[in-house]
């Protein structure tokens, strides 16, 4: 692909790290590419609506109610220069819950929340209007996914088609509860952070911090990848890749791809070379020996970076 391709344009201009004055910029870049190339019909387009917590989005209108969902969808359609979105995802739960790696769930009565049907009704109207085609969740729990699926079945409302949650060699917590729901209910995982912010490429080994890398740009925002057990696990996985003469990043991605509950693996890249390397992982084979060795490391260092 030439350097002027959509992937190149997006990776050169994407808003990383995201800030108040850059949110929505990636949609604009993609929208400009659609307008220029007329290739919208060749692309499966997914985007998200932000939940509570970012008060500068839509003037603080972060609830998943009909008004804010309509405003968010219309804003995305305008930036993307299209009249429909294939997959529209709720970025994180509106209710109080454990997501973004949070542990130690503590429930309180004031945290009771039961807007599943209201949200699905609003989504149903958006689907019937033709503005979106399918609905997905992100950073969701097994209970949340199950409740959405239950309500959609009872009320004949749109069904959750996917869940975009983190999954990698360093964070396999999805297997604990959500994997079974994904398989039985055919609501597959779109795995994000499969390379654990780049740690599973080996580029941060020995304390290295490459210029323009995510950890350089984000600073101390993702310290969970720097834990002692996380670093030890990374070294062990790196040893497996070296032993079997595998590219470390490709091995990490392929492991995710092989899981039966995964629909797709979301990759990110800073350069076209990185993008090509990531894509080539689809042609890699992982032997049973490699998979056994990976699982042994998981037993020693279980989910060190949730």
Protein language model features and the residues they cover:
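Short, acidic/polar
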Residues: 5, 65-79, 145-149
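Aromatic-lined substrate-binding rim segments of carbohydrate-active enzymes
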Residues: 16-38
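A short acidic, helix-capping loop that chelates divalent metal ions and anchors anionic groups
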Residues: 16-18, 53-58, 97-98
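Glycine-rich anion/phosphate-binding loops
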Residues: 23-28, 62-72
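Active-site mouth loops of central-metabolism enzymes
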Residues: 55-67, 107-114
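Beta/alpha (TIM)-barrel catalytic core signal, keyed to glycine-rich beta->alpha loops juxtaposed to Asp/Glu
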Residues: 93-296
């Amino acid at each position: 692909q030439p350097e002027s391709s959509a992937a190149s344009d997006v990776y050169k201009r994407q808003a990383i790290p995201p800030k108040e004055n850059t949110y929505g910029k990636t949609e604009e870049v993609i929208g400009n590419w659609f307008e220029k190339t007329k290739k919208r019909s060749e692309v499966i387009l997914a985007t998200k609506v932000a939940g509570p917590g970012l008060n500068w989005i839509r003037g603080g209108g972060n609830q998943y109610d009909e008004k804010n969902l309509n405003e968010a969808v219309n804003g995305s359609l305008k930036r993307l220069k299209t009249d429909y979105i294939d997959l529209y995802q709720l970025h994180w739960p509106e209710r109080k819950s454990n997501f973004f790696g949070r542990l130690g769930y503590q429930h309180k009565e004031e945290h009771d929340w039961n807007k599943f049907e209201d949200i699905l009704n609003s989504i149903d109207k958006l689907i019937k209007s033709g503005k979106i085609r399918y609905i997905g969740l992100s950073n969701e729990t097994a209970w949340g996914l199950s409740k959405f699926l239950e309500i959609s079945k009872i009320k004949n409302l749109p069904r959750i088609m996917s869940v975009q949650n983190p999954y990698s060699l360093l964070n396999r917590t999805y297997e604990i509860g959500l994997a079974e729901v994904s398989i039985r209910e055919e609501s597959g995982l779109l795995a994000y952070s499969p390379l654990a912010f780049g740690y599973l490429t080996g580029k941060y080994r020995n304390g290295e911090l490459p210029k323009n890398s995510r950890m350089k740009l984000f600073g101390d925002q993702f310290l969970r990848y720097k834990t002692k057990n996380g670093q030890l696990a990374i070294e062990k996985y790196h040893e497996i890749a070296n032993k079997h003469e595998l590219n470390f990043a490709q091995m990490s991605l392929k492991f995710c791809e092989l899981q039966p509950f995964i629909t797709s693996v979301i990759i990110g890249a800073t350069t076209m070379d990185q993008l090509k390397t990531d894509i080539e992982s689809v042609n890699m084979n992982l032997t049973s020996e490699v998979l056994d060795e990976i699982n042994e490391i998981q037993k020693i260092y279980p989910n060190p970076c949730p």
